[in-house]
Design a protein with these regions (language model features):
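Pore-lining and gate-forming transmembrane alpha-helices of multi-pass membrane transport proteins
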Residues: 139, 167-180
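Short, highly charged, low-complexity non-transmembrane loops/tails of multi-pass membrane proteins
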Residues: 191-217
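Internal alpha-helical transmembrane segments of multi-pass membrane proteins
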Residues: 126-145
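Hydrophobic transmembrane alpha-helices
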Residues: 1-63, 67
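Alpha-helical transmembrane segments and their lipid-water interface positions
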Residues: 18, 22, 69-80, 112, ...
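Interfacial helix-loop-helix junctions of multi-pass membrane proteins
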Residues: 153-163
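Membrane-interface interhelical connector segments
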Residues: 75-100
């Protein structure tokens, strides 16, 4: 329950923070970078402890909650503000997410998250549960790369020059992977604590990896 709540909060928070552009040294990016990688860390923890089936349900729950938030924000943005209210423009900048960007974001999230979970699950089986750090980093690279390759062309194609797209994708994936590596010691401790506390360490033997099969098997 705790991880489900935290996962959904991270996704919704990232959605809001994505509306701000920030600079870290020479690199420009969206502020969603601050929190979005946490969702991949939670994905790794849940998949490592409870398996792909539970992670699959978590991803769809996060998608549903994020979709609800974006939809309610769009409706509120569509309703005219009171005549005395001066925050209409600022509110629109946050909640007036263009359908193209919203659609690209949702598709990229689902594909990236499931790629991350699939790699994590399959590598746990092949390694007999060893090398968690390597599996966590590699699954993050796979998930984040998928997310970025889908999102940026669909959301920003034609808005920014196509020749800049590869460097933008590489920068995003690199920074998010570095984020994962920096917090990896914390992730390892969280996984160990959760396994011991819940007495769970699921291996996905015989797992059906159909993303639309909403059960634990």
């Amino acid at each position: 329950m705790f991880y489900s709540i935290l996962f959904c909060v991270c996704l919704i928070t990232a959605n809001v923070l994505e509306t701000k552009q920030i600079s870290l040294g020479p690199a420009n990016m969206t502020a969603g970078l601050i929190v979005f990688p946490v969702s991949y860390i939670i994905n790794d923890v849940v998949c490592e402890v409870w398996g792909y089936g539970r992670t699959r349900m978590l991803i769809w729950l996060g998608f549903a909650m994020n979709f609800f938030f974006v939809t309610m924000g769009a409706i509120a943005d569509w309703i005219p503000g009171a005549s005395y209210w001066e925050g209409e423009e600022g509110f629109h900048q946050i909640f007036g997410l263009a359908p193209r960007i919203a659609g690209a974001s949702f598709l990229a999230f689902v594909c990236g998250s499931f790629i991350n979970a699939y790699i994590m699950s399959r590598m746990k089986l092949s390694s007999n549960g060893k090398n968690f750090s390597f599996r966590a980093v590699l699954s993050t690279i796979g998930g984040e790369l998928t997310d970025s390759i889908i999102f940026f062309p669909l959301a920003l194609g034609g808005v920014i020059p196509w020749e800049e797209m590869p460097s933008l994708v590489i920068t995003q994936v690199t920074l998010k992977t570095v984020y994962e590596i920096i917090v990896l010691p914390v992730t390892i401790r969280v996984v160990k604590f959760t396994k011991e506390h819940d007495h769970e360490d699921v291996y996905d033997n015989g797992m059906v990896y159909n993303i639309f099969k909403l059960n634990l098997d």
